Amino acid sequence: KDFAVAGGGGESAMTVLKTRAVSGNPPSAAQIKGHDIQEWGGLGFLTNLDDVAEKGNWDGVVPKMVTDVMKWDGDFVAVPVNVHRVNWLWANPAVFEKAGAKVPTTLDEFFVAGDKIKAAGLIPLAHGGQPWQDATVFEAVALDVLGSEDYVKAFVELDMDVLSGDKMVEVFAKFQKMHDYIDSNSPGRDWNVATSMVINGEAAMQIM
């Protein structure tokens, strides 16, 4: 039986899942992200799926960097469903058409489109003012400004030259500018409510 847990970026769902698991009432399957699979594998809650993986030739068709995460102690214990990034831009074409704006492919294009959408009396960016959503937008801005190489240097290698450089100053300046395109009711808004704003044509875009 399906069950959904509202709120947050999955934190509430994980709390409910852990409570059910330790009380002896786990669901038959659950969506778990990335390296959390290793934690659940260590707790002994996951089932060996090697027979299914062998029939589907997962080791042969799925990249090793993905299968490594899907395994615990050398055995498949999770199904690779998709690989999802956080810098996706979701857009409502009808809102762009109404504002005479073009769906952006860069941050600078985002600001141009955002100005046109604001001028049309619509909300450019549907956003929820929650820490994890703010971090999602920050990551997207940082990737655009820094590029992939310096992004890795900054946030994986913690390279101080990049972290304290002019491009990082630009990251924070553009991140601050993003708030010019968010409505005043944003604080505390759940992500799914922001998504509904895009679907219903109240807002043009969401970064998620």
What are these regions (language model features)?
Residues K1-F45, E54-G60, G74, V103, ...:
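Conserved N-terminal structural module of periplasmic/extracytoplasmic solute-binding proteins
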Residues A21-I32, G121-P124, N200-M208:
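Alpha-to-beta junction loops
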Residues G34-N87, F111, V137-E139:
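Hinge/lid segment of periplasmic solute-binding proteins
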Residues E39, F172-M208:
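Extracytoplasmic/periplasmic substrate-binding proteins
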Residues D50-K64, K102, G129, V145-E170:
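Short, solvent-exposed loop/beta-turn-alpha elements that line the ligand-binding surface or hinge
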Residues W72-V81, N87, F111-M160, A203:
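Extracytoplasmic/periplasmic solute-binding protein
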Residues G114-K116, E157-G188:
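Glycine-centered hinge/linker elements that transmit conformational signals in sensory
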